[in-house]
């Protein structure tokens, strides 16, 4: 009855009799996702849930939603949605849940588990009212609270479509918390919901069957994510180093520009200094030239005065006939004084010249100015000990270390020869000395256990055919193919001890002391160096004999 009253209208709106509200008909999920992306492109810092609620309030109008976010009125709309949901939860505590709410009443962990199933469902299930419900249709008995829960589920779906990796990590975290809280309670709740709501029986049964498998898969994925987290941590560390390296590289380019700028400034300063020096020299030259002109003028003036005085004295000598005796004495004294000052005339001519200390000036010019060279304070980093240990722990170094600790071949062969009986064939001796660089492994009969490589046998080990097989095995081990493989070194290392025990068994048999029940090693396989199992009939015959 409620479904008939809540049918879709062609006008794009739906009247819900339960909540007495007019709801907009949202359309398909893809259309809603396009609207969410359109709002997210303009308002990137808002969550999908907030965008969906505001879109629902404005009848899925993108322009009004964006305007509400930009003006700040969207917070009031979100508060209205939150208050309405709380009131409805208080009223519906004691009411029985409708048939369409089991998937909404399940904890968040079950939502996260069933998200992938709901995404793989046909698009016809998502084409219900506004595209927000999970189970395919919404009844009239559902309130705004169930609608908001459906919107949260839709936001989770949108986040998974946008970022599948983050959604998978969130799913793993939720599943892990669900497993810690107890899987049995969760299964009991799911079985209870299954018994109450018979209309959802096939779907809930399928979920309850697939839930343990999904949980085990998620737990296995959580175990596999432990090294993944370690690798992410290492990658984050190397990302920090890469960022530091990038900053240093950018700073190197900047320092290169700084060096060029400093060089240009220094060259400009140098040219300016020498230009000042040149101007100073030119000024000094001009000053000296002017001074020389003054000196020349002064000297010429002095000489001119001397010339005039000489001419005056000469005129007086012409009238000396008319002078008295006293005047003549004065004239002779003046001439004598004039002539005595002749040396000053000579000094005057020598003083009027330019003198300078060019060498001192050259030395000062040579030492003029200093250029500071860059100091290379960089050094090479010494390698860490961890890198050295890693390099030493390589397989080649390990094999080299094991070969260096092996015993010397002469001591092995001499020890083996002393333990052989007189009746031992030389083939066994050749077999014992076939591997000179393998250490002597001494095995006591009481400490041996019947496992890999040792089985109790009878006198059959002293059989000539068996000795021939051992001899052929010794020759086979001496071949280049067997000695070249590093994976077979564990099998040849037991050869000296085996030959000693075989020699003791053979000597006991030839001396007639009885059949030796001491276990001897079986013949190794020719393919991979593993012990070869003999038939059980040979063992029973050896025991009976």
UniProtKB/Swiss-Prot annotation:
Query: Compositional bias (Basic residues) spans?
Result: 85-96
Q: Which residues carry this modification: Phosphoserine?
A: 143, 146, 148, 520
What spans are recorded as compositionally biased (Low complexity)?
379-415, 475-490
What the entry lists under Pfam families is as follows: SPATS2-like (PF07139)
Q: For this UniProt record, give its keywords in alphabetical order, as a comma-separated list.
A: Cytoplasm, Phosphoprotein
Record-annotated disulphide pairs: none
One GO CC annotation: cytoplasm
Compositionally biased tracts (Polar residues): 106-123, 369-378, 491-514
Q: Does the keyword Ribonucleoprotein apply?
A: no
Which stretches of sequence are listed as region Disordered?
A: 85-137, 197-216, 369-545
Its Gene Ontology molecular function terms?
RNA binding
Where does the UniProt entry say this protein principally localizes? cytoplasm
* Family note: Belongs to the SPATS2 family.
- The molecule here is called Spermatogenesis-associated serine-rich protein 2
- Per the UniProt record, the source organism is Homo sapiens
Its taxonomic path starts at:
Eukaryota, Metazoa, Chordata, Craniata, Vertebrata
């Amino acid at each position: 009855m409620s479904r008939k009253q809540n049918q879709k209208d062609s006008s794009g709106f739906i009247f819900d009799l339960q909540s007495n509200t007019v709801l907009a008909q949202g359309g398909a999920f893809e259309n809603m996702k396009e609207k969410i992306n359109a709002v997210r492109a303009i308002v990137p810092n808002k969550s999908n849930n907030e965008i969906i609620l505001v879109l629902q309030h404005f009848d899925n109008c993108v322009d009004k939603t964006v305007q509400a976010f930009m003006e700040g009125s969207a917070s009031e709309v979100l508060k209205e949605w939150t208050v309405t949901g709380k009131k409805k939860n208080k009223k519906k505590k004691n009411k029985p849940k409708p048939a369409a709410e089991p998937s909404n009443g399940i904890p968040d962990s079950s939502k996260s588990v069933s998200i992938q199933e709901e995404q793989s469902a046909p698009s016809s299930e998502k084409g219900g009212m506004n595209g927000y419900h999970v189970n395919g249709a919404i009844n009239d008995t559902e309130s705004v609270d169930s609608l908001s829960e459906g919107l949260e589920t839709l936001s989770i779906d949108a986040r998974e479509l946008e970022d599948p990796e983050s959604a998978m990590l969130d799913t793993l975290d939720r599943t892990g918390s669900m497993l810690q809280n107890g899987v049995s309670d969760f299964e009991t709740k799911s079985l209870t919901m299954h018994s109450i709501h018979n209309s959802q029986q096939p779907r809930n049964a399928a979920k309850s069957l697939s839930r343990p498998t999904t949980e085990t898969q998620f737990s296995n994925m959580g175990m596999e994510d432990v090294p993944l987290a370690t690798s992410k941590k290492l990658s984050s560390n190397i990302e920090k180093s890469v960022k530091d390296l990038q900053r240093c590289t950018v700073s190197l380019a900047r320092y290169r520009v700084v060096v060029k700028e400093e060089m240009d400034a220094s060259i400009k300063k140098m040219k300016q200094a020498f230009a000042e020096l040149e101007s100073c020299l030119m000024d000094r030259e001009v000053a000296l030239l002017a001074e020389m002109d003054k000196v020349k003028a002064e000297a010429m003036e002095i000489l001119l005065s001397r010339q005039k005085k000489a001419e005056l004295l000469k005129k007086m000598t012409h009238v000396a006939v008319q002078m008295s005796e006293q005047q003549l004495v004065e004239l002779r004294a003046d001439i004598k004084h004039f002539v005595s000052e002749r040396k000053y005339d000579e000094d005057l001519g020598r003083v009027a010249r330019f003198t300078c200390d060019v060498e001192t000036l050259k030395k000062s010019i040579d030492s003029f100015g200093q250029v500071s060279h860059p100091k290379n304070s960089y050094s090479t980093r010494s390698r860490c000990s961890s890198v050295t240990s890693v390099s030493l722990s390589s397989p080649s170094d390990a094999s080299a270390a094991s070969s260096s600790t092996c015993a010397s071949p002469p001591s092995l062969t001499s020890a083996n020869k002393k333990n052989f009986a007189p009746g031992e064939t030389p083939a066994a001796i050749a077999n014992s000395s076939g591997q000179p660089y393998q250490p002597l492994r001494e095995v006591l009969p009481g400490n041996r256990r019947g496992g890999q490589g040792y089985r109790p046998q009878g006198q059959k080990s002293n059989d000539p055919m068996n000795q021939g097989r051992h001899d052929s095995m010794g020759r086979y081990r001496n071949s280049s193919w067997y000695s070249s493989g590093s994976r077979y070194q564990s099998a040849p290392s037991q050869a000296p001890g085996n030959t000693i025990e075989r020699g003791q068994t053979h000597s006991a048999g030839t001396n007639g002391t009885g059949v030796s029940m001491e276990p001897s090693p079986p013949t190794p396989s020719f393919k991979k160096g593993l012990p070869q199992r003999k038939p059980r009939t040979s063992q029973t015959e050896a025991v009976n004999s």
